[in-house]
Amino acid sequence: MSLRVHTLPTLLGAVVRPGCRELLCLLMITVAVGPGASGVCPTACICATDIVSCTNKHLSKVPGNLFRLMKRLDLSYNRIGLLDSEWIPVSFAKLNTLILRHNNITSISTGSFSTTPNLKCLDLSSNKLKTVKNAVFQELKVLEVLLLYNNHISYLDPSAFGGLSQLQKLYLSGNFLTQFPMDLYVGRFKLAELMFLDVSYNRIPSMPMHHINLVPGKQLRGIYLHGNPFVCDCSLYSLLVFWYRRHFSSVMDFKNDYTCRLWSDSRHSRQVLLLQDSFMNCSDSIINGSFRALGFIHEAQVGERLMVHCDSKTGNANTDFIWVGPDNRLLEPDKEMENFYVFHNGSLVIESPRFEDAGVYSCIAMNKQRLLNETVDVTINVSNVTVSRSHAHEAFNTAFTTLAACVASIVLVLLYLYLTPCPCKCKTKRQKNMLHQSNAHSSILSPGPASDASADERKAGAGKRVVFLEPLKDTAAGQNGKVRLFPSEAVIAEGILKSTRGKSDSDSVNSVFSDTPFVAST
């Protein structure tokens, strides 16, 4: 008795005809994979290989039995409402496009997209989002397109798009933004690959002109601003005119949609087209100032190195740059030229600028792969820094000398008024004068001169007594009805002026300035 062992290929070869062997193997592989890996198409959805559409089915979450290897999932017009860490029950590693528009979504929590890490396109348009914050998209490292238009977004946190290093297009049209999202281009969370930003039809009244010059030209050409309620301003007008001259499609294609509000007074205003040539009446100095802020007018100093960048919209990859000087001289990379050098990224360096180097320089960028070319004109002004510094130094010296003279004059006046020195002789004379004045007052108030008073003082005292010894007029006959309060005025006067040698000056003073009241007799 012999034992024969048959393997599966042997058994298949004995039972199945050779022509059907491959078909049976394929069937066995399909059964081995099973429905757990492949998934089924739910009754609420329509499936086509790697595309699943579950639109308008009143879904509040993603069905768990979807095909896990799908690449596109459309869940629009449902009732999802809130995106949290559990709204997708399983992981979809192959999913690269997720459409969630018209779902009344009001909030997005951190970790909502942890099960879809390979998304490249996310559509959250036409929902009810009010804010975007806390880096809710940080798991989407390879996201390229994000649609957030037609929401109620009024605030964007600077860190909201942190980690989206591959994001190229961002749609924010039709929201309630009141400020241009400058943090997308500068700062810690800037998006270096962002080439398209649509913030049209928001509520932005002005642009940050002092920071817009920090945005490279290849990113500037993809900023769409039309439909915002701008306030008429020459700086904004200069910016849009400059974009129009550079043939940016964001301005060329929507020229009539750029409007601004012109206020005639505090209550009345009218809306006008911003890019009309005749209505703004902006001076050349303001326009040139805006171009200088944008980096297209440069100030150079004689002898000081200057570097000028070619801010082209074509970018640096696969782009060749050449410069044309004011004298039509061709400046190319890697060529020896006196005082000039051009880098491969388009930057022009003037080692030691001279007055004759001033003028308009044209940078020509040619991208052969994209069949694009652009010419950027840059104005360079050259001035002498030593002359300007000498004038400034002279002006400073003059001002400082004048100020020092004024301070010295004030100090001298104060010293003269409050700190005038007085010698000893001056002090002695001052004391004698004070003594004479006190004696004179005593002689006036005393009835007679003191025993030790000098002859001059007695004369002075006698002269002073004349005031009190004027003869009293007799008004008894003609008083005209006046009441005579003191019938014996002469007697009282004599009593006051009668000299008593035994009394001191203090007693005389006390007698005159007595607090005892006079009583009128009738």
Curated annotation (Swiss-Prot):
Alphabetized UniProt keyword annotations: Cell adhesion, Cell membrane, Disulfide bond, Glycoprotein, Immunoglobulin domain, Leucine-rich repeat, Membrane, Nucleus, Repeat, Signal, Transmembrane, Transmembrane helix
Domain Ig-like C2-type: 289-379
Domain LRRCT: 228-284
Disulfide bonds: C41-C47, C45-C54, C232-C260, C234-C282, C310-C363
Positions bearing carbohydrate: N104, N281, N288, N345, N373, N381, N384
N-terminal signal peptide: 1-39
Residue spans of the LRR repeats: 69-90, 94-115, 118-139, 142-163, 166-187, 193-214
Entry's transmembrane regions: 399-419
Bilayer topology term: Single-pass type I membrane protein
Alphabetized SMART domains for the sequence: IG, LRR_TYP, LRRCT
Stored PANTHER family: AMPHOTERIN-INDUCED PROTEIN, AMPHOTERIN-INDUCED PROTEIN 2
Protein's name according to its UniProt entry: Amphoterin-induced protein 2
Organism encoding this protein: Pongo abelii
Taxonomic path: Eukaryota, Metazoa, Chordata, Craniata, Vertebrata
Gene it is expressed from: AMIGO2
